[in-house]
Amino acid sequence: MSQDRRDVVRGLPLYKQGASHGENAVKLSSNENPFEPLPSVVEAVTRTLPRFNRYPLMSAEEVRSTIAGHFGVDVSQVAVGAGSTEVASQLMHALAGAGDEIIFPWRSFEAYPILTKVAGATPIPVPLTVDLRHDLDAMADAITDRTRVIFLCTPNNPTGTVLHTDEVVEFLARVPENVVVVMDEAYCHFNRDDAAVDGLTLLEDHPNVVVLRTFSKAYGLAGLRIGFAISTPEISDDLRRVATPFTVTTLAQQAAIASLAAEDELNERVNRIVAERTRVFDELTRQGWKIVPSQANFLWLATGDDTDRIDEVMVSHGVFARCWSEEGIRLSIGLDAENDRAIEALSQAVKG
């Protein structure tokens, strides 16, 4: 590795994991599913335990076939990785390199600029609009002959705002066919906006679209690490070529298969989280907090210069959210009692 390359790596910010301290701490910082794994998923993992002396199948054929059947696509269109973040990294390495550019909204998923630089490409962040949505016109204007990939995050992390089908279709009309548009839909299960885009509906007419999803959020498999992309067979094949071997464990593959078979139970839990999201939003709005309506399993509090003080108050009450100094606080939706503690902590912060 050259000295210049080492300097780039050493200059990368470390990804900041959501904080949690102490036995009685309430961790609302990582957008995790607060419910324990479904019994059928635990059973599937348990059955797999005696076999983890063997490597997982690199082809991941069974889980890819199950995903394909669930979403009505061909298995050749599905690629998997150890979480959607790894699949995003695969996309960048497969499609971009030195001298290339990757466009994404900002603020958005904080791994985007890190992964872009690791791939050797140049990050092109495009600021959100004043209402914290993607500025699609500005993103289209940012396209150059060096653009290789564009990320759209819907619902957006950390603001919870969504893109609508009509505006995405208009945006795609401005994107060259050789530029890949990644629809990062990690939080799509929590969306209740009928106008919101579903990336899967775009694939037939837009072969440069890739849909990125995960089992970490709604499915509750964050600790097992499995995500997937659905795209053209050609792009999926490229992803498998650059993937690190054996990263998607046998346990993760079987848990994902079992999760897709438990859709009714999954939806019941998601509906409970969405109901709590509405309750917490209403309570905090009554307290006077400035919150954008969210279609994810978290809320964004625009706290600006007061962010660090509010965070200190929350931590003093044992409540840990994800904070960005001078910008805002992302509060994950947890169990009812956990949300009650967050509401109480924030009521004390607003008094301060």
UniProtKB/Swiss-Prot annotation:
Gene3D superfamilies (UniProt xref): Aspartate Aminotransferase, domain 1, Type I PLP-dependent aspartate aminotransferase-like (Major domain)
Any GO MF annotation of the entry: aromatic-amino-acid transaminase activity
Keywords for this protein: Aminotransferase, Pyridoxal phosphate, Transferase
UniProt keyword Transferase, yes or no: yes
Top enzyme class: transferase
Residue list for modification N6-(pyridoxal phosphate)lysine: K217
Cofactors that this protein relies on: pyridoxal 5'-phosphate
PANTHER family: HISTIDINOL-PHOSPHATE AMINOTRANSFERASE, HISTIDINOL-PHOSPHATE AMINOTRANSFERASE 2
Function: Aminotransferase that catalyzes the conversion of aromatic amino acids and 2-oxoglutarate into corresponding aromatic oxo acids and L-glutamate.
Name of the protein: Aromatic amino acid aminotransferase
Gene name linked to the record: pat
